[in-house]
Regions:
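Membrane-core helix-loop-helix motifs of multi-pass transport proteins
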Residues: 137-226
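Lipid-exposed faces of alpha-helical membrane segments in multi-pass integral membrane proteins
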Residues: 40-48, 114, 118, 202, ...
């Protein structure tokens, strides 16, 4: 039975390699940076406005310039999602936790499964958090287990697939926030109808099962792996220097952070006790308060 299982796994792995290698070459050759998509889509919309709606070129440019900053608040919210997620992932508490989790990876297969699952969980919590946690965890595992580094990094970023069904999904949280740009058309839609809806949770659970298994099946054959020198992934030691002046001691003191953090915790408890729902502002505020205690 064991030989049959091993043989079927190798067969699946070979088929996945046959499918994935042409796709990898296609993406490497033809997939540009996201900025290029922004420019192309902007030009396509401008052309459509002139061809379909009959607007002149200068009228289209005028509308584009006038509306350029209308999404400034939304852009700031997205920036805070990324910044707070990055800061949380970079805290010593999270880094120590990732190092301990990396000790559980006793084999290359386990390493791929583990980094995929951790990346999925972190991305579901916050997509900015997941982007950084996945990369840091892949480095932590590569320092301890000899595993194909290409697949390890790909697995670390594959968890990003669940971000829009997670707690920091931009559209679900945006339409749950009063005053969003499309409130006049669709109203305010609470997260119990989007993020926490049964169909969305089913998809997320299915991805938590499928993505690690697919990544595990894509492991290259022996002799085809690409390894990285663990010494290149060593984390620099950051010295914790105590303040020598009153200003530096105040800056390094946790007391002020804990006091303002306590006010933030009190507000969050009051908000959710009053049947408050998740919104972009609440998620960002929650991460900011958590950062004050880490």
């Amino acid at each position: 039975i064991a030989s049959c299982l091993v043989g079927s796994e190798m067969c699946i792995r070979d088929r996945l390699n046959v499918i994935s290698r042409p796709l990898v070459r296609l993406v490497d050759r033809w997939l540009p940076d996201p900025y290029i998509f922004v420019v192309i889509l902007t030009l396509l919309v401008m052309i459509a406005a002139m061809a379909i709606e009959g607007h002149g070129p200068m009228a289209v440019v005028g509308m584009w310039g006038a509306g350029f900053w209308e999404l400034l608040s939304f852009a700031m919210q997205m920036l805070l999602v990324l910044v707070t997620g990055y800061m949380m992932a970079s805290t010593p508490l999270v880094r120590r936790g990732l190092e301990r989790l990396a000790d559980l990876a006793g084999s290359p297969g386990t390493a791929i499964l583990l980094v995929s699952f951790v990346s999925l969980a972190a991305s579901w919590i916050n997509w900015g958090f997941g982007l950084v946690v996945g990369a840091l965890f892949a480095k932590a595992i590569a320092r301890k287990v000899r595993v194909d580094y290409r697949l390890l990094v790909a697995s670390a970023y594959s968890g990003f697939i669940v971000w829009h069904g997670g707690l920091a999904g931009s559209v679900p949280l945006a339409i749950a926030t009063a005053g969003h740009p499309f409130e006049g058309a669709i109203g305010v839609i609470a997260t119990d109808r989007t993020i926490f809806a049964a169909y969305n949770l089913f998809i997320v659970i299915a991805l938590f099962i499928a993505v690690p298994l697919v990544n595990r099946m894509m492991m290259p054959r022996p002799g085809e792996e690409v390894f990285v020198d663990p010494k290149l992934l060593a984390e620099p030691e950051v010295a914790d220097t105590p303040g020598t002046t009153p200003a530096e001691r105040m800056e390094n003191s946790r007391v002020l952070s804990w006091l303002i953090g306590a006010a933030g915790v009190a507000w969050l408890v009051q908000y959710f006790a009053g049947s408050g729902t998740l919104t972009l502002n609440v998620v960002n505020f929650l991460f900011l308060i958590c950062l004050l205690y880490t």
